[in-house]
Amino acid sequence: MSIYHMKVRTITGKDMTLQPFAGKVLMIVNTASKCGFTSQLKQLQELYDTYQQEGLEILGFPCNQFMNQEPGEEADIQEFCETNYGVTFPMFSKVDVNGKNAHPLFVYLTEHAKGMLGTKAIKWNFTKFIVDRNGEIVGRYSPNTNPKELEDDIVKLLEQ
């Protein structure tokens, strides 16, 4: 199964697959509104503003699995992200990224891009996965990695 066949739900409740993003460079991120890394939403939006026309899509998936840092409902999350960080990149409904209820997209991502010491589990909010235009996962980055640090890698993928 390719990543593009994964079923997701937008933050406004629309069911879809990732097929509309085929042929694009993707950065898939588990987000949270009350996290020490929440300010990364600003950098994510800056990357999106700069490179969306060249084929970058940033996909945000709110997650409440880490210290209850995303307790709100989807409408609250969307309003927070838009009001405080000007987020216009696609946001999706809240998901689990680990455990028996983990969303199939994150099961797929963690099976194909392991973390430190070969672990599958996502350790915290704002773990980032980069997917190339062919749907191959080419990188997994920790929450400590600022999105802007990935700009050179993104540009190289966009140029392919």
Swiss-Prot record:
Record keywords: Oxidoreductase, Peroxidase
Which terms does the UniProt entry file under GO BP? cellular response to oxidative stress
List the catalytic residues: 35
Family designation:
Belongs to the glutathione peroxidase family.
List, alphabetically, the CDD domains matched: GSH_Peroxidase
Pfam families hit by this protein: GSHPx
Instruction: Name it.
Output: Glutathione peroxidase homolog BsaA
Annotated EC: 1.-.-.-
> Where on the tree of life does the source sit, at the highest rank?
Bacteria
